[in-house]
Structure formats: structure tokens, C-alpha cells
Amino acid sequence: MAKEKFDRSKPHVNVGTIGHIDHGKTTLTAAITKVLSKHNPKIAFRSFDSIDNAPEERERGITIATAHVEYETANRHYAHVDCPGHADYIKNMITGAAQMDGAILVVAATDGPMPQTKEHVLLARQVGVPYVVVFLNKCDAVEDAELIDLVEMEVRELLNKYGFPGDDLPVVRGSALGALNGEAQWEAKIDELMEAVDKNIPLPARDIDKPFLMPIEDIFSISGRGTVVTGRIERGKVKVGEEVEIVGFRETRKTVVTGVEMFKKQLDEGLAGDNAGLLLRGIGKDDVERGMVLAKGGSITPHTKFKGEVYVLSKEEGGRHTPFFKGYRPQFYFRTTDVTGVATLPAGTEMVMPGDNVALEIELITPVAMEKGLRFAIREGGRTVGAGTISEIIA
């Protein structure tokens, strides 16, 4: 049977469920597919067990169990990630294995916000998940409506505390299990939730609409023509004759792109996703090196000091066998290159164990083009021992 063609007519959005263990994230994911499959026979219902027994994947050497579910509403196509274990969520969010354009925060009305609720909301803020919609689950198990009001207030306060618009974002009250069991009043709440997701999680900006950026992978001298740098265009587009900046390692310089080449053919412009060679005016082979980036003027700047949200690989994942302490000095791998840096541990933390997640302050020995949300790896002698996301730039 031929594979069904991916329908590009509907805009695509990536979402995920977050929240405390046993608050009903996976049950909700299953319930969404069940209710939507009633409206649209093309949508596959995914049972709780099929989502809960998610296969383990390796993302940059880190083992993460993630279930990928897809469904659509009248207006959009969604890819939805759900993780069986708490550690899987942490790894997923920090490594960006599954980028989320928005999250559905699941809180059991029977419990209210719990430690992992807070941890997931904080991480969502740190790694740049931009929008949150709340589903108060298990409302069928709470007889006193005032108790649900209190839980809703607590959730809104928690979101405010971590920089989300807690007073304004939608909170839907429901029962994922009730909906999964086909109870009409709770099925209607799943429809209400998906309407809230449709309305409150905006379409992400497409990579091609963002300012041009290409990490430099290789440099060639072409006699009589000049210097060509190659790499994969990460975002935006670049036209022949455009001025760009070379950012990272040294003083930022301006140059003009005098040629764009792909597969030995000359092009007028290079687009996000293209593996391209760019000919640069007035630049010698020694003026550029791997790890610098070419970018639209003023769109990105070089820095050495930043805060990062980091997951340290466990021994089983091929990470360190021992903890590290203050003054830890590994390599930090950004885009295409390693730069040495020193890590400062949070106040009151003596050491960091393999398998931990931790907020580090890092100072690099040379400046790198960076911005909040950029992912990086931590390496020792070419071996990955950690993964992180920049949560704040200091200097």
C-alpha cells in the first residue's frame, strides 16, 4: 500500500503534553486522538498503551523515550510529543529533540500543581517553549467546584511566577479518562481544549522568514575568484550582492556575497535548508574559520558568558562515570565547532552527577555567535557528556 502523502494544505504545529507524573498526560494524548478520530476518520486513534510504550530513541547520544502522535483539527495538522518518564521530559526539552511551538500543561484537579509541574513549567520557560494552554484533568473526581477554582488559581499563579501570562491563558476543565471512555460531556471538553490550542498557540515563524544565518563548515580558496565558505543555511535566505556579517571568534566583519553555488550550479539565492557554497568579496582564506557564522547584519552577536540549562549524560548513555565540580573545563560544541569554557555551579551545589540536570553559568575562552534558545553539547575529547540550551546571555 502506498504511503499516504503528507497533506501540506493545513499549517503544521508541534505541541506536547507536560506536567506531573500520573496527572494524565498520556491519557489526555490518547483521548485527543480518540475524540478527533470521531470527527475525521483519517485520524488514527492511539491507545494509552501504544503511547505509553514509546520506543527509545537516541538523540545526540542521549536515550529518550518519546511517543510521536499526529492528529488534525479543522484548521491545522499537529505533531504531538508525549514522554512516558519524567527524565525523558527533561532530556527532551533540554536537547530540543522534539521542538514544541506550544505545550499543553496537564494538572490533576485532585492534586493541584506538584513538584514536576513546577519543574516542567520552569524548563518550558528556560528553553523557550513560547505558549502554554492548561488542561485541568480528573475534574470528574472532584465534587466541590470551589476546590477546582482553587487549583486553577494555583496553576495561574505558578505560570505567572515563571513568566507566562497566567491570568490570560486558557484553562480547560475536563476528564481525559471520561473522554477516552466515550462520555459525551467530557468529549466536549477535549473539543474545547483543541479549540483553545488552535486559537492560543500561534503558527511558528517559518525558518525561511527569519533573518539569514549559515554556520561555516568548510573554507576553500578558488584562485582568481576568492574565498568560498560552505555550510547548511539554518534560516532565512541570501541573495547574490547582499551584505552579510561574519560573526564569532574575532571582530565581526562585513562582506558581500558575490556568488551562491549548490551542487556545482550557480544560483541567485540560497534558502533555509540548502547546503550551499557562498563566495565572499575581499575575504582571505585565513579570515574565516569553521564555527563562525555568516548572518544578516545585526541579527546575531558574539558572546562568551551565558547561563545554560544542562542535562549531564549518565554512565549508561556513554557519559562521565564520575561527578564534576566547580571549575569544570570541557568543550562546548555550538553548531559546527568546539570552544573551551569554564562552568560555574549554582550556589550551594558542590558537584554535578551523571544523569543530573543543572543550571550552569559558562564562560568561553573565545566569543561565539549565540542567542537565547541555542542548543549546545558538552564534550570531553570529542565524546559528548552533556547537552544544553542557552537560557540567558550575560556578556
Curated annotation (Swiss-Prot):
Segments of this protein annotated with the region G5: 175-177
GO cellular component terms, A-Z: cytosol
Region (G1): 19-26
Residue ranges, annotated region (G3): 82-85
GO molecular function terms listed in the Swiss-Prot or TrEMBL record: GTP binding; GTPase activity; translation elongation factor activity
Chief place of localization: cytoplasm
Protein's cellular compartments: Cytoplasm
PROSITE patterns: G_TR_1, G_TR_2
Function: GTP hydrolase that promotes the GTP-dependent binding of aminoacyl-tRNA to the A-site of ribosomes during protein biosynthesis.
Record-given protein name: Elongation factor Tu
Gene name for this UniProt entry: tuf1
